[in-house]
Amino acid sequence: MKRAIILVLDSFGIGAAGDADKFGDVGSDTMGHIAEQCDKGLADNGNRKGPLTLPNLSKLGLAMAGKESTGKFSAGLDANAEIIGAYGHAAELSSGKDTPSGHWEIAGVPVLFDWGYFTDKENSFPKELTDRILERANLPGYLGNCHASGTQVLDDLGEEHMKTGMPIFYTSADSVFQIACHEETFGLDNLLTLCQIAREELEDYNIGRVIARPFIGPGKGQFERTGNRRDLSVEPPAATILQKLVDEKGGQVHSIGKISDIYAGCGITKKTKATGIPALFDATKEAIEQAIEQAGDNTIVFTNFVDFDSAYGHRRDVAGYAAALEYFDGRLPEIMDMLQEDDILILTADHGCDPTWPGTDHTREHIPVLVYGHKVPAGSLGRRDTFADIGQTLAEYFETSDMEYGKSFL
């Protein structure tokens, strides 16, 4: 019985990539800078204090992978841990440092074209685009039309949105069109319908994602984004390993969290939504249990832990990011202990989002590639030239046809 469990620690980069200069990210290091701040006592809060403590990830080779990426061990991590898994770091071949590019490349399909972007900080969207969206949605107008932090824009425009019923349109350095609306005054269904209209109207702009950003709360300073976020992505430009597993092997791909949205549902046979790292962990364990009970051969359980990125990376919350990593590390053995003889566990990321870096955007970094299983030899996988090595490895593991990109590390 072959099963692969893929856990994406969204934004957990481990050192600047070789082409970071093209993105203004030379010197970025999500893991290293978090560890450094923790070691200096600058990341203490009510949930954690002191050096970054990740014993289970260190046993899988995280500290070693970080050293291979940057040339030095991250402060406080156990450099002498007994390694029980295969570890390495991967560079990104894709042209961007966004979520779809990273995930598609992990699944064997790098994004070699350039996404469309809304580069103007103010008046970001073409008038003909917003006019068509408003006309189709029968709305009187909109707010925003700018680059913005997702939480700041709620404080700035949330109350006006509630009074007027006008949605908040905003974007970022990523290829995204984001729409924020209040779940109660505007309605979640209305927001999702509006996002579908925007997705259709953006077809000619080559924008990667339309993101629904629902929120609740009575007023400024009290608004909170909910777990009902939706990402409306374009479809990958070629068959991913997920699609090949389903089409060629009759396999199962169980998506946890926003994975299904990222792949536009392509190659997904079952999806489970969950909000927050604890709930995502629980849902992942339940999916693994189901696969084992049903003797599910040729199965992938694929989880994205988005909070590392959305709640801590973009918000530049070092202490929150560190606490979340330590929570994740503490629960990791629960999944490791579930693995059967032929199962493999892959832990990785899709890009960086260094919480010590200027601004609020992603950072161009290497990602960790940690692989564990009863039949996986411990040791270094070295530097991988593309995230697609993961997809190619899965193609070899499941005996599908080869992916066009990547080299297997099995």
Swiss-Prot record:
EC assignment: 5.4.2.7
Keywords for this protein: Cytoplasm, Isomerase, Manganese, Metal-binding
Domain of life: Bacteria
Molecular function GO terms recorded: magnesium ion binding; manganese ion binding; phosphopentomutase activity
Binding note for cofactor: Binds 2 manganese ions.
Pfam families to which the protein is assigned, alphabetical: Metalloenzyme
Gene3D superfamilies according to UniProt: Alkaline Phosphatase, subunit A (3.40.720.10), Phosphopentomutase (3.30.70.1250)
Catalytic activity: 2-deoxy-alpha-D-ribose 1-phosphate = 2-deoxy-D-ribose 5-phosphate; alpha-D-ribose 1-phosphate = D-ribose 5-phosphate
Chain positions recorded as Mn(2+) 2 binding sites: D309, H314, H362
Segments forming a coiled coil: none
Residues holding Mn(2+) 1: D10, D350, H351
Gene Ontology cellular-component terms listed: cytosol
UniProt cofactor(s): Mn(2+)
Enzyme class: isomerase
Subcellular location(s) of the protein: Cytoplasm
Listed GO biological process terms: 2-deoxyribose 1-phosphate catabolic process; 5-phosphoribose 1-diphosphate biosynthetic process; metabolic compound salvage; nucleotide metabolic process
UniProt key word Isomerase: yes
Family: Belongs to the phosphopentomutase family.
Cross-referenced HAMAP family: Phosphopentomut
Protein name: Phosphopentomutase
Naturally occurring in which organism (per UniProt): Aliivibrio fischeri (strain ATCC 700601 / ES114) (Vibrio fischeri)
